[in-house]
Amino acid sequence: MRIAVIGAMEEEVRILRDKLEQAEIESVAGCEFTKGMLVGHEVILLKSGIGKVNAAMSTTILLERYQPEKVINTGSAGGFHHALNVGDVVISTEVRHHDVDVTAFNYEYGQVPGMPPGFKADKELVALAEQCMKEEENIQVVKGMIATGDSFMSDPNRVAAIRGKFENLYAVEMEAAAVAQVCHQYNVPFVIIRALSDIAGKESNVSFDQFLDQAALHSTNFIVKVLKELK
């Protein structure tokens, strides 16, 4: 099976790239694609760059050029739920934009005109990820909504504003909704699996740097477990 894994930054893809066998690297429009084999699957690892435009552009190239059967977006995120801690993992059930507002024209907050209000992750991939999480003992793994915007959430006032827009929001980051929207348009199953590098609004600029490597390791290990179970 051909599986695409997307991470925004070098820190988020480096560990997984080192695990790929027969790796071949290709650069297209500033995006790094690494093809290789891992646990019996052909894996296309994309380093997309940070933010929604980079994520949308590179995911489009990915789907057109490599035609993966499934897409997994990995990396770090800011935790938005009071019960979560740094290093915990969030599996997406739904992904939304948190910086889109066309409510003046009767769209839901976060809804892009012509698109659904949110993008549903593939139920089979979510269930598989949830099954894999049962083996985790020292890391809390939850499933829920992830929201995306082109901002790093270090301002408590902005955090409070976003919390007021979405119920049961578990994490925020800067690429997932763009990846999900492109996958929706191409009808390619996707899931977002993010490890928390910080808790939004609580000294985010400090804890992000401190815990990014830990979050990347947790996320990568979890991705490998999911790949092992994919049939």
Curated annotation (Swiss-Prot):
Binding-site residues for substrate, renumbered to this chain: 78, 153, 174-175
TM regions (residue ranges): none
Protein's GO biological process: L-methionine salvage from methylthioadenosine; L-methionine salvage from S-adenosylmethionine; nucleoside catabolic process
Pfam families linked to this entry: PNP_UDP_1 (PF01048)
Reaction equation(s) it catalyzes: S-adenosyl-L-homocysteine + H2O = S-(5-deoxy-D-ribos-5-yl)-L-homocysteine + adenine; S-methyl-5'-thioadenosine + H2O = 5-(methylsulfanyl)-D-ribose + adenine; 5'-deoxyadenosine + H2O = 5-deoxy-D-ribose + adenine
Active site: 12, 198
UniProtKB keywords: Amino-acid biosynthesis, Hydrolase, Methionine biosynthesis
GO cellular component: cytosol
KW Nucleotide-binding (keyword) present: no
UniProt pathway annotation: Amino-acid biosynthesis; L-methionine biosynthesis via salvage pathway; S-methyl-5-thio-alpha-D-ribose 1-phosphate from S-methyl-5'-thioadenosine (hydrolase route): step 1/2
InterPro entries reported in the protein's UniProt record: MTA_SAH_Nsdase, Nucleoside_phosphorylase_d, Nucleoside_phosphorylase_sf
Keyword set includes Membrane: no
Function: Catalyzes the irreversible cleavage of the glycosidic bond in both 5'-methylthioadenosine (MTA) and S-adenosylhomocysteine (SAH/AdoHcy) to adenine and the corresponding thioribose, 5'-methylthioribose and S-ribosylhomocysteine, respectively. Also cleaves 5'-deoxyadenosine, a toxic by-product of radical S-adenosylmethionine (SAM) enzymes, into 5-deoxyribose and adenine.
This protein's name: 5'-methylthioadenosine/S-adenosylhomocysteine nucleosidase
Organism: Bacillus cytotoxicus (strain DSM 22905 / CIP 110041 / 391-98 / NVH 391-98)
Gene: mtnN
